[in-house]
Every structure is written in structure tokens, then in C-alpha cells.
């Protein structure tokens, strides 16, 4: 894998609501494992939902570790629904990520409050 362009991602998950006892719960724990392994192909899959529950401070954490985050996942908290249904200020967060020049992927991993189509309505303002 060292000579490959493949990236292997590790994802911290919250142990407070979704998976009690999960072994990897913070961004720093993931970074420590990556450092211990010492392979340039290892990165963090940063799940905004899980890290809001475990750490808060999403914007500074993303900024500090941007080079190690090639993929983010999103859902609002609480409830794990689409952006705009909970406590995360996604307008601010997306603007911040954009200003940082993020070139990675952002995936949606949430349970729509109603239908899938309605659950994608939040994205319209970002596609203009």
C-alpha cells in the first residue's frame, strides 16, 4: 500500500449516543494511531455528526487537521438528520471549509426527517 495512491481512512465514532464502547472516539485518537503506524496513506474520515457530539469545536479542529482529512461526512445533531435540523451552523461551517481551500470529499450520511427528496432540500442554496 505504501507505493499506491490509495488512501486508507479511519473514522472516529461517538460512544455517547450511537455506539457505546467504540474504541476510537476523537480526532486526536485517530491522528495518534496514524502517527503510530507511520504510513503516509493513512488519513482521518472526519464525521461532523460524531465529532460534534464528542468534541465540538468543529471549525478549529478541521482547520488544524485539514491535511489529514480527505473525506468528511455530515449529519446534524441531535437526531442525525439533514443540515438545518439541529445545533450545527452548517452555513458557517461550509463557508469556513471553503475558505480553507478544502479539496476533499464531503458525503451525506444522515436519516432524512421525512423523505429523501425533502431531506436533500437544504443543498439548494449551496448549488446556486
Model-derived segments and spans:
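Short, small-residue-biased leader/transition segments that mark boundaries at the very start
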Residues: 2-3
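Histidine-acidic metal/acid-base catalytic patches
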Residues: 24-46, 50-128
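Conserved beta-strand edge residues that scaffold enzyme active sites
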Residues: 14-15, 111
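Surface-exposed cleft-lining segments at the edges of enzyme active sites
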Residues: 15-22
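Short beta-strand segments at enzyme active-site cores
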Residues: 7-12
